[in-house]
Amino acid sequence: MHEIYLIGLGNPGKKYYNSRHNIGFLLLEKLSKKYNSNFLLKDKLKSSCSEFQINNYTFRLFLPNTFMNNSGYAVRAIVDWYKVNLDQIFIIVDDKDLPLGKIRFRRKGSSGGHNGLKSIIEQLQSQNFKRIRIGIGSPPLIKGENNFNTISHVLGNISLEEKLILDKVFKRVIESLEHLNTKKEDHIINELNSFNQD
């Protein structure tokens, strides 16, 4: 039985539930619900966890409860507990440097300034894990200044218009993840990176 570990990044709690920074949580909750699997809190993994099978693959889903900037502690706990090879891990994360609705699947790379990815890299001492980045668009400029209002943007709630776009994105990503056992990874990477929600 093959095992796939999907880790969505976000912040726990109602205050942050529908924020742009919680894209990873929202996508994995949608996937878990599709397979009638509930998330259960596991303190030793510092995460809420869900598990189900698709054909001969076991999908294990995790929502860290460490808050975004400490995501690496949860990922480290998951890797240590399950003795996971890093190539089995997929991190689902928001990206303010991508236009809303764009997807980027990479097998490895730097944090790109994302604190959740930075924490994971620090804890794993490696950049060699897969990540699916979902664009939330650039933050607006602060009126009268040359600075971007990044914190308000990433922690702000997803609007109805954004949700309509992200629903299409989530559907595309979920369909690709479901075919990890039938399609070559290169094909899935090309599918996601060329996705256009229009």
Curated annotation (Swiss-Prot):
Transmembrane segments: none annotated. TRNA binds at residues 16, 67, 69, 115. InterPro entries: Pept_tRNA_hydro (IPR001328), Pept_tRNA_hydro_CS (IPR018171), Pept_tRNA_hydro_sf (IPR036416). The record marks 11 as: Discriminates between blocked and unblocked aminoacyl-tRNA. It catalyses: an N-acyl-L-alpha-aminoacyl-tRNA + H2O = an N-acyl-L-amino acid + a tRNA + H(+). The record marks 94 as: Stabilizes the basic form of H active site to accept a proton. It comes from the Bacteria. One of its GO terms (biological process) is rescue of stalled ribosome. Its main location: cytoplasm. It is an enzyme of class 3 (hydrolase). The keyword Cytoplasm applies. The active site is at 21 (proton acceptor). One of its GO terms (molecular function) is tRNA binding. It is found in: Cytoplasm. Keywords: Cytoplasm, Hydrolase, RNA-binding, tRNA-binding. Monomer. NCBIfam families: pth (TIGR00447). This is Peptidyl-tRNA hydrolase. It comes from Prochlorococcus marinus (strain MIT 9301). The lineage of its organism: Bacteria, Bacillati, Cyanobacteriota, Cyanophyceae, Synechococcales.
